Amino acid sequence: MQIRRADGTDEEALARIRRSAILALAVPAMSREQAEQWATRAAADRIARAIRDHDVWVAVEEVAIGWVEVDGDRVAALYVSPSCSRRGVGSVLLARAETSIRSSGYTTARLESSPNALDFYFRRGYVRCGPPDAEGAYPLRKDLTTVGPNQGMEPAR
């Protein structure tokens, strides 16, 4: 698996990964209807803006299998193709995001987690920092100044 920066040619693949990950993994943490609404919310133009304006990294094994978006100190998105889940792709992408956040001078990483991904983030040192928002996303944070689960893990390039 290689990790590389996303570019404009990745937009459709990233949108497809996002949609399939949400529909495959969000239920039963949310209803099928809620998952459908979430999956259709961000179209390819949102992904194009993310690639242009933020750090977006893609995991590739011949084709794109996952991606992560970093906006300042925030992990704005992290999705892995359902056919590649539980193979460490998300962990490598999250480590890459944390490296990017640290390199930008931040000492804390922030994100909003869907209910189905909470355990993934908790196992990697994230803690809740507030109640869920109106859409059910939980605000999480991680101190990047101390060594903890998966910290210091250098992702493949």
For each feature predicted by the language model, list its residue ranges.
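Conserved catalytic-core motifs of GNAT/GCN5-like acyltransferases
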Residues: R110-E112, V127-R141
